């Protein structure tokens, strides 16, 4: 399937003119930029031949530095040296302070509760810091390619929510970049490996970077990359390995827990150096703050084993979501510098029953995949037959009568996607409808997550069920959700784009999925009860209107029978007996059959009054 290339006005390229595109891996610890030259994707190095750019920015009154220069200042000016800013993206200040209580920065809250970092250059938000990193990467690409970039593909963790994805887009725009697409990091890795090997089947992408962990189960078939399931933890990565080892070194060296920032940075640097060395050596000598000691790989493995186990539990959940067994996975792709840790490779190999793939540099594989995709999207490969299908992590739907959730787009549906369902009014003369957008796997509103609310007004005043409202859910390639409600006869509509100020955590996603399984039987019963109660309310509402209009058609005895049946239905509808409510509804229907027939006859007579048979 070829991707259709559509050029914007004024941007149409000559038949043989290549556009300049780049793939950017905006990482927590390090970032990279890559491009396709002479048909090969490659990462771009700086003047000293270094491909990685530390995701660190040092701010001063007169300017700022990014990367290695910034990192060298970290120990001397910790408060003005911002690192791992990706972890702060799209989060509220309260969330950040709860998750990361030991950050060496001073924060202030903006009016909407988002974080502002105090620096020598003034108050800066995470979007601005990310933009400065992107500018440095773009400058490297512009110099290497001898021209301005026509577009970029930027990778994000699969578990990034709407706010985090939107923040990444905002940072790119602030950096002056045209974003062709945001691409999930595991999907980018699949592109890098899938195109090279031409392999078909199920592949697991294990991505353990500096600050995030993602596991994706993908199916590769005839050039189609389909994500069957995703999982992970946006607050777990190699940085956590570093901090555990730094704390261990601090304890061994007898350094106070609340020492100054310079010593803390020195401890962290020593831990990082030791971690890297232990990937090749059985032990390493550490010198820090006047203390010298030996640390073995065995000690390091003992420290990080619980974190590695957490990643494997996420792998197990993702496999279950995908409906595949570990032995069905053909290959395991390792992504992220932290996958160089021997214990990680060993445990992942044991879990999947095969040695993981590491033939492409795990630091570079995501950027390479992004560059390949950017080259296609910018129009340099119009005959490409690659199609990307990402998925949404949790079902999306609407609240309906009775506090029920009607799922419109199920979990793990490939995106981009658009789905629509028709709804109707519940009461006579209803002229407005409240649209409550929900996220989650449970059957009741109280057990799902509220995403947004908006109202559709201007609905024609018709009998209950007379107006028809089409609600459309659209999730774009970046995972952003738009919901539109339109009344069919008038065309009146209202819409909303879901951009929460802060997002859903990975543990909450895992918990919601787990709860949906644990309470499945209970939820089905609760839904059946709620549906019967809604039907009872509808029947009573309709009957009340009919009696108010045409009670004269009934004898006293008939009216009493109907009133008794209605009273009984009203009573049992307050309880929890589904069968009793259903039987009471049937009884009301039975008692009102003759009444309904008389009302129909009366309506026909009124319609024919004054007309001859010939006219009919």
UniProtKB/Swiss-Prot annotation:
Gene3D superfamilies: 1.20.1270.10, 3.30.420.40, Actin, Chain A, domain 4, Substrate Binding Domain Of DNAk, Chain A, domain 1. The keyword Nucleotide-binding applies. InterPro entries: ATPase_NBD (IPR043129), Heat_shock_70_CS (IPR018181), HscA_NBD (IPR042039), HSP70_C_sf (IPR029048), HSP70_peptide-bd_sf (IPR029047), Hsp_70_fam (IPR013126), ISC_FeS_clus_asmbl_HscA (IPR010236). One of its GO terms (molecular function) is ATP-dependent protein folding chaperone. It holds the Pfam family HSP70. Keywords: ATP-binding, Chaperone, Nucleotide-binding. GO terms for biological process: iron-sulfur cluster assembly. Chaperone involved in the maturation of iron-sulfur cluster-containing proteins. Has a low intrinsic ATPase activity which is markedly stimulated by HscB. Involved in the maturation of IscU. Belongs to the heat shock protein 70 family. This is Chaperone protein HscA.
């Amino acid at each position: 399937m070829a991707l259709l290339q559509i050029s914007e006005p004024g941007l149409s390229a000559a038949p043989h003119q290549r556009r300049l595109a780049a793939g950017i891996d905006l990482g927590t610890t390090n970032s990279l930029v890559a491009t396709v030259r002479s048909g090969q994707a490659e990462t771009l190095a700086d003047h000293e031949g270094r491909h990685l750019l530390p995701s660190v920015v040092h701010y001063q009154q007169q300017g700022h530095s990014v990367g290695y220069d910034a990192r060298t200042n970290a120990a001397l000016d910790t408060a003005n040296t911002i690192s791992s800013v990706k972890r702060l993206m799209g989060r509220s200040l309260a969330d950040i302070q709860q998750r990361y209580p030991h950050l060496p920065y001073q924060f202030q809250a903006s009016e909407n509760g988002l974080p502002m970092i105090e620096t020598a250059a003034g108050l800066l938000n995470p979007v601005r810091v990310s933009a400065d990193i992107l500018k440095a990467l773009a400058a490297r690409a512009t110099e290497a390619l001898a021209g301005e970039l026509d577009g970029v593909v930027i990778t994000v963790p699969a578990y990034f929510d709407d706010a985090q994805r939107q923040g990444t887009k905002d940072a790119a725009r602030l950096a002056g970049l045209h974003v062709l697409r945001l691409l999930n990091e595991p999907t980018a890795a699949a592109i890098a490996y899938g195109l090279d090997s031409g392999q078909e089947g199920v592949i697991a992408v294990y991505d353990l970077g500096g600050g995030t962990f993602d596991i994706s189960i993908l199916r590769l078939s005839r050039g189609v990359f389909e994500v069957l399931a995703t999982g992970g933890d946006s607050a777990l990565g190699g940085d956590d390995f570093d901090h555990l080892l730094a704390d261990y070194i601090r304890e061994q060296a007898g350094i106070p827990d609340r020492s100054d920032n310079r010593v803390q940075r020195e401890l962290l640097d020593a831990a990082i150096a030791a971690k890297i060395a232990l990937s090749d050596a059985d032990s390493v000598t550490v010198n820090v703050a006047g203390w010298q000691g030996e640390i073995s790989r065995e000690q390091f493995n003992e420290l990080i084993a619980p974190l590695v186990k957490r990643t494997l539990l996420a792998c197990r959940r993702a496999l279950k979501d995908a409906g595949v067994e570990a032995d069905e996975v053909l290959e395991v792709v390792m992504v992220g510098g932290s996958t160089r840790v021997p214990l990680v490779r060993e445990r992942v190999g044991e879990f999947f029953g095969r040695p993981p793939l590491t033939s492409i540099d795990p630091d570079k594989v995501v950027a390479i995949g992004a560059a390949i995709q950017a080259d296609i999207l910018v129009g340099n490969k119009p005959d490409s037959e690659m199609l990307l299908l990402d998925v949404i992590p949790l079902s999306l739907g609407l609240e309906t009568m009775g506090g029920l959730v009607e799922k419109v787009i199920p979990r793990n549906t490939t995106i981009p996607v658009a789905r629509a369902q028709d709804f109707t009014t519940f009461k006579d003369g209803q002229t407005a409808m409240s649209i409550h957008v929900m996220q989650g796997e449970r059957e009741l509103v109280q057990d799902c997550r509220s995403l947004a609310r908006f109202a559709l007004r201007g609905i024609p005043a018709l009998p209950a069920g007379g107006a028809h409202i089409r609600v459309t859910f659209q999730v774009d390639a970046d995972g952003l959700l738009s919901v539109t409600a339109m009344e069919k006869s008038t065309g009146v509509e209202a819409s909303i784009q879901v951009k929460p100020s802060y997002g859903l955590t990975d543990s909450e996603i895992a918990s919601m999925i787990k709860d949906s399984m644990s309470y499945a039987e209970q939820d089905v019963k609760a839904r059946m009860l709620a549906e019967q109660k809604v039907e009872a309310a509808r029947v009573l509402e309709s009957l009340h209107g009919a009696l108010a209009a045409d009670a004269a058609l009934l004898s006293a005895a008939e009216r009493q029978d109907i009133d008794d049946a209605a009273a009984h239905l009203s009573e049992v509808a307050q309880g929890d007996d589904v069968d009793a409510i259903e039987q009471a509804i049937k009884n009301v229907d039975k008692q009102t059959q003759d009444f309904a027939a008389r009302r129909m006859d009366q309506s026909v007579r009124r319609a024919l009054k004054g007309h001859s048979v010939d006219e009919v």
